[in-house]
Amino acid sequence: MKNKTRFALFLAVLCTAAVLAADYFVPLQTDNPDTGQLPAVYDGRKNGRAPAVKNQGSLGTCWAFASLQALEARLLPEESLDFSEDHMSLNNGFCIPQEEGGEYTMSMAYLLSWQGPVLESEDPYGDGTSPKGLKAVKHVQEIQMIPGKDYEKIKRAVLRYGGVQSSLYTAMNGDRSKSDSYNESASAYCYIGSEPPNHDSVIIGWDDGFSKDNFNVPVNGDGAFICMNSWGDGFGDQGFFYVSYYDSNIGMNNIVYSKVEDPGRYDKIYQSDLRGWVGQLGYGNDTAWFSNVYKAEESQYLKAVGFYATAPGTSYEIYAVRQAGKESDITEGYEFDRKIFLADGAFENAGYYTVSFDKKTKKELKLKKGERFAVIVKITTPDTVHPAAIEYDAGDGRTFVDLSDGEGYISADGKVWERVEEKQNCNLCLKAYTAAQ
């Protein structure tokens, strides 16, 4: 093949031990969260959108607490659920003990593959064990990544989705810790420096007038995010604290759980990327074609496809091939000429998105039991050279990848294809969803 594919590593640990049916949205009484004027002060605690404060104890599980507390905030006030951090931190498929921390792409992989969330009552925190066979009580179908330091977008995401998971650096590791960056009397935190983030929390509000004099270090102006921590209610203001807008890391890495559904909209998820977005693959430009071939386990309708946009402004075209042939037919360029157009569009933010095909005719998308079918995506991501998200073993001992469960193909032009498991030692992050009707 003339066009040579290339990898880009994505996974990095950010958090250490220092550390459907309904689209839930609660509008404010005043402004539209997407376009209206932002208030100078917003506090999710006063709007019923802050979940209960929790305590990670001595384990490096802040990433799991922040992820699930942001997810809990997403559902409030209609639903008040307590999700299990133990289950997420013990069943995510990464070779990282609870003591050593984790980061948000691990949370994304766990939730998007329907491994969870499960309820805290089913898997209580801190015992080091996790029951087998627990089912996810919600299905996360979309996670958006808010651009770094875009405070307006972060604030609008807080208004719309309840909480934004974000990262910061701290030398503290619990509610009794001390730090030159933390003013305990004002529950005010600001770190200015070059240390990378090592702790995750949830932004649930802000105060543009929070005085710069509250911080132990000089800052250029007033203003702070109101953040929910995971060190119990003995830390800060009953578990919450104020992080300066001028902190070096807050607002750099941000995710929101933008679409959460009750189980039942889709009956089956087809996937080969349980570890999720570990790296990226491409041909040295911003466009690539990629496809996964699956075998229908039941006679059902193809209802949706899910994949990652690896940077803002990603556009896509989605196709399907019924009765897909054998590998040699695909790699020689014959089989995918029969593709059926399903959808196209674009995403403002990076993240994971599920695109449904409700407007397609049932005849086109009715799969027979045992039928091989292909889902195909043409993706264009501006200013990137590796637009396709992949799961692969980065060689750092943190990721175990099973290449036997996937049949994926990638192409530079949509005509000549190569098998990624054999040629690139990876799985493609491309899921398919089916339902009985």
What are these regions (language model features)?
Residues 1-2:
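N-terminal secretory signal peptides that target proteins for export/translocation
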Residues 6-20:
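Sec-dependent N-terminal signal peptides of Gram-positive bacterial secreted proteins and lipoproteins
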Residues 25-48, 64-72, 89-312, 317, ...:
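Predominantly the structural core of cysteine protease catalytic domains
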Residues 56-79:
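Alpha-helical support elements that line or immediately flank enzyme active sites
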Residues 77-87:
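Short, flexible active-site-proximal loops enriched in glycine and acidic residues
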Residues 207, 258-261, 322-324, 430-437:
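Short beta-strand-to-coil "C-cap" segments at the C-terminal boundary of structured domains/repeats
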Residues 313-401:
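Aromatic- and Gly/Pro-enriched, solvent-exposed loop/edge beta-strand patches characteristic
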Residues 369, 378-437:
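Short, surface-exposed beta-strand/loop patches at domain edges
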